[in-house]
Amino acid sequence: MRVGWAVGPVDVIDRMSSILGHVGAWAPRAEQVATAKLLDDAAGIQTYVTEIKRGIVSRLSALHEGIQAFKAQGLPVDSLSPEGAIYLTVRVAPFGKKTPDGKVIATNEDVRKLLLDRAGVGVVAFQAFGYPDDDGWFRMSVGAVSLRDIQEALPRIGEALRSLS
């Protein structure tokens, strides 16, 4: 369960409050007391935040470096250097190539399915965020995976791309 707060325009907060009033999603008293106590521990919070950031940077860097290594090997991929958040912007564009079973990769959906089915990796196409083009741009999250997960996934991604002809 999460304990949190929101800050924003009065009309937005009022609408949020009216929704929450009907959801019954209030945090139990024990969690509220524990959160209040935690907020008094500035050093503890800073240590926690520092560790979280360090882990995110490590995972983003590993994923970016892996994608760039594939690019250097001539695979049809690229990634933008991470600048924050928990997402890496990647381009996976093997358009026109065929899967081992003869399917031509023609759309971002084809790429998404290839990575999911052959590498066990989920990606979100930029179309989900309103980007109109079907040109291989995706978002990959490192928020819920470990460094080891990334290190194990990269070879599978490479194998999936190398399986195309």
Predicted regions and their residues:
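PLP-dependent class I/II
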Residues: M1-S165
